[in-house]
Structure formats: structure tokens, C-alpha cells
């Protein structure tokens, strides 16, 4: 119980600290660029046309809504984080209880030791089920978080309170409105998890020497590196999910010119791929203007 409480508190603290970062990231993902590009230099010293980074973008938001405005959407995101942690823990706890029941039921019969690969498959499958359950239950809060952020673009106040936002979505879109963008989000999470754990297994098994004294440390490093690599590869799923969550919801940021009305998440994916925007919002620093794009001052976006 104390373990779960500490996880919730730690997660909530990290959520609060990272809220301004997520706010900026979401607005960039939608395509909103309130500040014109400037001429700067990249890491190799070459002159490039750069878009404002995280700090300039955050400063712009604070100049309009104050520093408190940087924490728009925090309440539903905290609810999502707390509920997700609890659900994730409960699902894993259920699997642990099932294992104990099997062990006690088998009596003194010696269980066959499973291979490390089988163990990875088993643990990854359980983690996938736990994450999927948490994502499914918390997605409505995720949708509200995104929409409350995106309304900054049109200066709307449609999604302000948690209860009012729930009522608005249900009234206008029904139950399905709470799960806009769920499928690409689930797919991205699942692919990222399996990719991360599979790569970590291969690295730990075939690339690292088991005789090294710091083996456990090396394994934790490899897990972190493969996790970062997997998240980079599956970023398009995150982008598509977030865009579908705000698409055609009555906000300026979810309608043309910032986004066409997508018929499905696959349509959104194809459109982004065609425009070369699959990595939009992936980087918050050293953001250069993509080749062939120009900045439109009136629309505050790249066209």
C-alpha cells in the first residue's frame, strides 16, 4: 500500500513539473507556431532558419496567460496519472496472485525452470495488459487534457472545468468522444513496449558479457537506451493519437487551417506522411524550418 502511494506521489510530482513541457509539445504537434522563425546556427555552426524552442514558446504562453497558464490541463492529467498508476498496479498484482495460487496448488512438484526468453515474453505480455488497461480507463482524461490545451490557439473556453468538459464531450460526441485517438495510442504503446523489451533482451543476452561485475547496471542502461530508441520509432503513433483526440471537436486548433477533418486515424497518418510532418513536435530544441515550408504570419503556422 505504501509502495502504491509513493508511486502515485512521485508520478504526480513529475506530472506537475513536466506540464509546461507537454503543453508546448501539444501546441507544436497541432501545428501552431505563434512566433516567427529567426536566423540562427545549428550544432555544426551553419546558418539555418530556426523556429523558437521550448523556453521561447513557454515564455510566449506566459506573456498571454501568465505563468499559471503554463499549467493548463493539469487537473485531468493528474487524474489520468493517478488512476493509471492504480489500475496498472492492480493488474500486475492480479497476475502475481495467480502465480502464488499456482505455486501453492502444485504442492511439492518441482516446476520446470523457464528460459530467459520465455520469461521476457511472459513479463512483457503482462506489462502490455497492465498498460493497455490503464490507457483504456484513463484515455477520457487524456482527451480532456489535450483539448483544454489546444483551445489556447483560438482563445476558447469550451473545456475549462473537468465536469463541464465531460458533459460537453458527452453531449456533442457521445461515449465515443471520450476515446478519440485511442487506437493509435494503444498501438504505439504496445509496439514500443515489445520493441524495447525485445531489443533489451537481445543486447543483454548476446552483446553484454555475463561475467562483468557491473552487469545489472549495464542491463539497466541498455533498457533505458532501447526504451528511448523504441519511443523515437513509435512517435508517429503519439502524434496521430493526439491529433485525432482534438480533430473536429469544435476548437480552432482541431479544424482547418491547422488540421483537415480526418475521416480516421489512418487518414491522418497518410496525410502527415504525405506532408512530411510525421516527426512534428518530436524535438523542442534546434527546431529548423522544414525544407519547402514557409511561415505564414496571419495563420501562425508553417505552410
Curated annotation (Swiss-Prot):
Mitochondrial intermembrane side: 2-15, 93-135, 200-231
Modified residues (N-acetylalanine): 2
Annotated compartments: Mitochondrion outer membrane
KW Protease (keyword) present: no
Membrane topology annotation: Multi-pass membrane protein
Pfam annotation, one family: Mito_carr
Gene3D superfamilies on file: Mitochondrial carrier domain (1.50.40.10)
Residues exposed to the Cytoplasmic side: 37-77, 157-180, 253-280
Example GO biological process: positive regulation of apoptotic process
GO molecular function: membrane insertase activity
Residue ranges of Solcar repeats: 2-98, 118-206
UniProt keyword annotations, A-Z: Acetylation, Membrane, Mitochondrion, Mitochondrion outer membrane, Repeat, Transmembrane, Transmembrane helix
Record field: transmembrane: 16-36, 78-92, 136-156, 181-199, 232-252, 281-303
One CC-aspect GO term: mitochondrion
PANTHER family per record: MITOCHONDRIAL CARRIER HOMOLOG, MITOCHONDRIAL CARRIER HOMOLOG 2
Summary of subunit composition and partner proteins: Interacts with p15BID.
Family: Belongs to the mitochondrial carrier (TC 2.A.29) family.
Function description: Protein insertase that mediates insertion of transmembrane proteins into the mitochondrial outer membrane. Catalyzes insertion of proteins with alpha-helical transmembrane regions, such as signal-anchored, tail-anchored and multi-pass membrane proteins. Does not mediate insertion of beta-barrel transmembrane proteins. Also acts as a receptor for the truncated form of pro-apoptotic BH3-interacting domain death agonist (p15 BID) and has therefore a critical function in apoptosis. Regulates the quiescence/cycling of hematopoietic stem cells (HSCs).
Name this protein carries in UniProt: Mitochondrial carrier homolog 2
Highest classification ranks of the organism: Eukaryota, Metazoa, Chordata, Craniata, Vertebrata
Amino acid at each position: 500500500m505504501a509502495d502504491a502511494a509513493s508511486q502515485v506521489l512521485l508520478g504526480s510530482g513529475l506530472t506537475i513539473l513536466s506540464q509546461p513541457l507537454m503543453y508546448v509539445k501539444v501546441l507544436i504537434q497541432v501545428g501552431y507556431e505563434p512566433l516567427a522563425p529567426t536566423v540562427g546556427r545549428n550544432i555544426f555552426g551553419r546558418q539555418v532558419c530556426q523556429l523558437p524552442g521550448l523556453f521561447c514558446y513557454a515564455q510566449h504562453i506566459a506573456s498571454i496567460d501568465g505563468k499559471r497558464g503554463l499549467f493548463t490541463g493539469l487537473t485531468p492529467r493528474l487524474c489520468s496519472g493517478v488512476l493509471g498508476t492504480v489500475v496498472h498496479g492492480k493488474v500486475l498484482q492480479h497476475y502475481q496472485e495467480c502465480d502464488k495460487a499456482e505455486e501453492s496448488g502444485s504442492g511439492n512438484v518441482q516446476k520446470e525452470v523457464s528460459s530467459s526468453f520465455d520469461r521476457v515474453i511472459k513479463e512483457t505480455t503482462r506489462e502490455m495488459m497492465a498498460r493497455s488497461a490503464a490507457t483504456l480507463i484513463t484515455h477520457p482524461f487524456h482527451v480532456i487534457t489535450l483539448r483544454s490545451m489546444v483551445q489556447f490557439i483560438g482563445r476558447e473556453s469550451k473545456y475549462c472545468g473537468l465536469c463541464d468538459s465531460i458533459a460537453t464531450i458527452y453531449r456533442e460526441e457521445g461515449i465515443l468522444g471520450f476515446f478519440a485517438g485511442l487506437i493509435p495510442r494503444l498501438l504505439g504503446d504496445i509496439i514500443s513496449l515489445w520493441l524495447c523489451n525485445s531489443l533489451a533482451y537481445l543486447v543483454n543476452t548476446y552483446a553484454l558479457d555475463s561475467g562483468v561485475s557491473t552487469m545489472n547496471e549495464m542491463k539497466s542502461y541498455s533498457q533505458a537506451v532501447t526504451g528511448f530508441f523504441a519511443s523515437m520509432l513509435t512517435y508517429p503513433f503519439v502524434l496521430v493519437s493526439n491529433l485525432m483526440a482534438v480533430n473536429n471537436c469544435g476548437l480552432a486548433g482541431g479544424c482547418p487551417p491547422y488540421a483537415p477533418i480526418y475521416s480516421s486515424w489512418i487518414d491522418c497518418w497518410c496525410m502527415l506522411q504525405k506532408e512530411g510532418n510525421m516527426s512534428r513536435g518530436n524535438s523542442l530544441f534546434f527546431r529548423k524550418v522544414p525544407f519547402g515550408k514557409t511561415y505564414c504570419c496571419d495563420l501562425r503556422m508553417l505552410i
